[in-house]
Each structure stands twice: as structure tokens, then as C-alpha cells.
């Protein structure tokens, strides 16, 4: 791996430096060519940084700011008050060329607003989309977008999302021809809003895409499609439903509380089934797929779950590294240019 630098909003997320610093330490231990520019409050962060190995500390540059994005105020107000905040400084570091990517667990709306404000958009993209990997029961994953950047999306935006998702899946999932689907309330041709119908008819006639039609939300984890396209409203609801169910099942197996469940587990076949089911559920553990990306920008901006723990935040950092290594913005830009030349 070539040398690369990530800008990190240390204060972002529910737990701030207590999660972000141990997570970046894991990344530094795994990637000897990696370094960080950190933005946050030195009062909270420096004691934790001093506990890291000396070699790791040498690959960290810390920029103090006591300002953070207030998650309790409206997005527009937070954007106006964002100057000097740890989140905004991290994004500005990417724009200035001090880092190749930004990772933050802060307010999603503010992060998207700042990214669209400061980071140059790709030519041919009207609005960026929030994309993430959705785990499947077979251990594979699908790319899903938009997950909340655009509450509404007309057919033109949906088609742009499809283009970006297709290129993203080719690189990240190493697929020559990803299966592409539109999220809908049914698989019948007549189902869905007008925008979905319009996008559907265009995609059906695209010989260069492996478009398979509509997919319903109950099939999201069946790995029937490699790229799932929708507006941000539907995508955000679907994603949280999937993650919530997976997390609750994992919690049930980690901490059985009902006496009949404990008695059942005490039998040999109960323990055998427990371990088999638990291993299967680990395939869809949301922590392993933490990190959503704003596709459609000239730089990599990754949003971690605010509630992420150390391991989950570590996965978000790795997600950013993987995109830099795969030159995702460059590949999306090249793919869009090639598409427009062929139209």
C-alpha cells in the first residue's frame, strides 16, 4: 500500500475519542503506511493518544479545536455554526490536499451538507448519494444507495445512482457485471411511483448494465442483486430495519435472559445449534459493514454510525482506505465520461 493520510473527526459519534482513537490505533497497527490528521478537543483526546505505542503516535498529527457540530440543532443552523468544528476541519483537510479521505461519526445531515459545500462534485452527477454495503445471509454483500442523502429522487437521479452503484460494485466487490435492481413495493411491471417506473424503462434498454428489475425489501439480504437503487427516504428506512433486526438477534444470542432459553442451551444439541446460528448471524453483523460513502464527490467522505463501537469504527476506516486504494472517485468519473460519450 502506498502512503496515505486520513482526516478524522475525533469528536464525532456518541462516544467521541473513547471509540475513534482505539479504532484508529487498530488501523495503524494493520497498515504501516497509514497516517492520520486528527481534529478534536485535546483535553479529551490527548490522554488517549499518549496511551498509544510511540511508533503509532509518530504517524498522527493532532489539530486542536474545542468546537463541535451540535447534533441537537437543525441542520441549516448547524451548517452556519460549523466553522472551526472538528467535522468541518476534517473535510477542509481533504479539500486542501492534506488527506485523501475524511471519516466522521457525526451528524449525517451536517456531514453531507459540508461535503457537498466544500468537496467538488463529479461531472454528470446532480446530487451525491449515500452508499453502503448491505450484508447477505450467504456471507456476501450488496451495494445499496441512496441511504439518506436525498429524501426524494426523480428518475434522472435514480439513473445516476445506478451508474455510480454499478461502478462502485465493480471495484469494491470485484464484479465484472453486477446485478442491478430498483427497490420497489412489488416486482410487477406496473408497481411503483412514476420516477421508479421511468428509471425502470430506461434501465431495461441498457445493454451495458445487468439490470434484473425490481426487488422488494424482504429480499434485501438474500443476495438477489449486487446493486440496489432507491431514494434516500426508502433506503434509510430499509437499512435501519435490516440493521435493527440483525443487531437484536445478535444481542439475543449474546445475552439469553429467559430461563427456558438457558435450559435449552444447556443441552448438547442446543449448544451446537446456538454456535451454528450465531456464526451465521455474524455474517450479517452490521458492525462489519459500518461506513457509508457519499458517492458522486471528487474525494472520499465516509460516515460512520454515531453509535459505532471500536470495531465498527475500525471497519469504517478500512472502508475509506479501500476506496482510496481502488480510486473510486476517479473510476466513477471515468465511467460517467465514457457513458456520456456513448450516448
From Swiss-Prot:
Enzyme class label: transferase
Keywords: Cytoplasm, Lipid biosynthesis, Lipid metabolism, Phospholipid biosynthesis, Phospholipid metabolism, Transferase
Pathway it works in: Lipid metabolism; phospholipid metabolism
Reaction equations catalysed: a fatty acyl-[ACP] + phosphate = an acyl phosphate + holo-[ACP]
Lipid biosynthesis listed as a keyword: yes
GO molecular function annotations of the record: phosphate:acyl-[acyl carrier protein] acyltransferase activity
GO cellular component terms, A-Z: cytoplasm
GO biological process: fatty acid biosynthetic process; phospholipid biosynthetic process
Source domain of life: Bacteria
Compartments, record wording: Cytoplasm
Record note on quaternary structure: Homodimer. Probably interacts with PlsY.
Family: Belongs to the PlsX family.
Function: Catalyzes the reversible formation of acyl-phosphate (acyl-PO(4)) from acyl-[acyl-carrier-protein] (acyl-ACP). This enzyme utilizes acyl-ACP as fatty acyl donor, but not acyl-CoA.
Protein's UniProt name: Phosphate acyltransferase
Protein species of origin: Haemophilus ducreyi (strain 35000HP / ATCC 700724)
